[in-house]
């Protein structure tokens, strides 16, 4: 049964595949992936994910700009966003949080613990579906 919708936004096909496979092992997760910030804005508004995993460095529209646009739309403003990035120095993480992200997951990540990490950022009502 899939109750938890995760939208992954990353321009790297390999990252999208690893996240999809890792979260797909848990039957409670349904995932969709986008390769750009522009696609993410449309998909998030239409699909209403439980959480968005958002790459920081993407061409055309980077993660922080995508987050700002998500926050401007009443249909997506409430969706928790977690940045997925290799840029995890304290000052950068502080900046991401100040922009409205709920947290940061560092690349590279451990595919075996990704589901648990994602669950830790879910709103309590959503996470309570977890075993």
Which role does the model predict for each range below?
Residues 13-32:
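Two-component/phosphorelay signaling modules centered on CheY-like receiver
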Residues 33-51:
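Acidic, metal-coordinating helix/loop segments flanking the phosphotransfer/catalytic sites
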Residues 87-88:
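Short, conserved "switch-loop" micro-motifs in signal-transduction and mechanochemical regulators
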Residues 102:
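Short, glycine/charged-rich "phosphate-handling" switch motifs in NTP-dependent
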Residues 109-118:
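C-terminal output helix
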């Amino acid at each position: 049964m899939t109750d938890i919708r995760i939208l992954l936004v990353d321009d790297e096909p390999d990252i999208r595949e690893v996240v999809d496979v890792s979260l797909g092992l848990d039957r409670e997760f349904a995932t969709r992936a986008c390769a750009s910030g522009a696609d993410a804005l449309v998909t998030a508004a239409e699909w209403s994910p439980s959480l968005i995993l958002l790459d920081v460095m993407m061409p055309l529209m980077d993660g922080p700009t995508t987050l700002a646009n998500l926050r401007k739309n009443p249909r997506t403003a409430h969706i928790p966003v977690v940045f997925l990035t290799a840029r995890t120095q304290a000052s950068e993480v502080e900046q991401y949080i100040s922009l409205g992200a709920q947290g940061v997951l560092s690349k590279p990540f451990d595919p075996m613990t990704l589901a648990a990490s994602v669950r830790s950022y879910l709103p309590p009502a959503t996470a309570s579906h977890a075993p």
